[in-house]
Amino acid sequence: MITTVQEISKWRNLWFIRMQSRKWYPVLKKTPLVADGRKIIKHADKVPHPEEIIHPFYQPTAIEQFTACATEYNPSLLDGKKIAPSLIKHPVSLKTILVDSKLKFDDIRGVNRWLMEFVARRQHQRNIVLTPASKSVRSFHVLHLSSTDIAKLRALENVLSEIENTNDLQSRVESVNNELQNIFDRDSKQTRLFCEDILAYLIKNYGNSTEKLILLINVTEMQLYSRLDQMKAMNIILYHILCKVEANENPPYSPTLVTALENLLAAINNRFFPGRCENSLHPIVIEQLLSYFIKTGNLNESKNFLGHLIKKGILPEATIINRYLEAIDVHFDKSTKIFDIRSKFAFIADLAPIIENYGTIDLFKFLIPMCRHFDELCSLLNIIRKSNNAKRAVDSTLPIFIKKVLTFTKDPMINSGNLSTVFNMVSPIYGQNVPSEFVEKFILSFALQGNYTMMAHMIDTYKIKLSHKYQLQIIRALKNSERNHALKNTGAVGYNKEFKKYFIEKYLNCTEREALRP
């Protein structure tokens, strides 16, 4: 029994401290963490912080947000399924790991705050403005060599011209490097000859073969600790090297060339930086390196350079982005396995601003198969609807959307509802006059669900002509529906025997319809 003012005050303070110590974000039930088939530890499996979720296009609608905030027990997004790609801290090693998380809360506390932060983060990504890398490269790559300067390089050019093979690469590199040093030794102190201009000139004019380009890359590496003492100089040289790589060879590149170039990049990092040099590279050089690493199949470096470009507010060329997506598909063999989809999300997480504001048809086609929940699909479709090329994008992707809708569940009524949602979302783009080719695809999809009411409604509303061939397609779809959804929803309005009989008699006139009679 609490009898004194001091005791009352003590218990009140304890209660206050306890309330203050509660985690703002709700915690899920404790679940075992398993790795390599062994239980490591039981830990509190939290709903990830919004900053930890790397999904580049999922945005909960107002209805989803309201439902989550109005549900007392276990409110969730994406039906609480384990499909939200996240980068979280491992509870034991504290290393960052990639997982599929469940956006499922214990109760309603803190859900509104979590949603506000998540939506704010998506809004921030939406507001990022990207501009293409400047096509005017004169500002950093112009060679400051006069005709008099070039005349001083004659002996060096002769050395390069006399090299017929690079079998003894080291001795050839030393010969060129020694002659380069002689030029500086002979030259007066008043000269404006710079090592970067000489090397860029040689690369531009004598780097037309893979062998000589490798030789000049090695000479460049040797000069890193003598005359190439600024990152600005390396921008000039890297630009010309990468131009030659692009012009000289088609992938796959020579392994020796790849090794030489990547050794040079590593040497640049060691010379100027303790880590990586992207911050000091010109955006065009970063874009060149991105293109190079995509072509060599180095996805990790490609992701690094792509993310760095976007963080700097640079929009990569559409062709480069498309090649990057193709490289991801090649690496994962267009897999739809859960683990591979999660890994794919890690490689495209940086693309959020591009998806939101600069999405292309190829990018949207890449993203549709990655959706594992209908709400993800709706988020993507909403982005397409708001894009500058909405109609053209929907024309190209709608058949893929329709097909994808039917993969989330086997329940014909849910599928029918989802098909109706997609149809209603795209109708305004066409001024309610959806092209008949798309309406016909919707009708066949409703037939696969055995939904006679929606089929009849769309045929009448859009005055679809039922050719003999199209009737046969409908019949095949209805037969598949009967096999796949046997005895399910047979009494529901729109699905029952009466509606089936009515539909067959009114809309089908080919002899094959007898096979469908109830």
From Swiss-Prot:
Keywords: Mitochondrion, Transit peptide, Translation regulation. GO terms for molecular function: translation regulator activity. Residues 1-19 form a transit peptide. The keyword Transit peptide applies. It is found in: Mitochondrion. It comes from the Eukaryota. One of its GO terms (cellular component) is mitochondrion. Required for translation of the mitochondrial OLI1 transcript encoding subunit 9 of mitochondrial ATP synthase. Belongs to the AEP1 family. This is ATPase expression protein 1, mitochondrial. It comes from Saccharomyces cerevisiae (strain YJM789) (Baker's yeast).
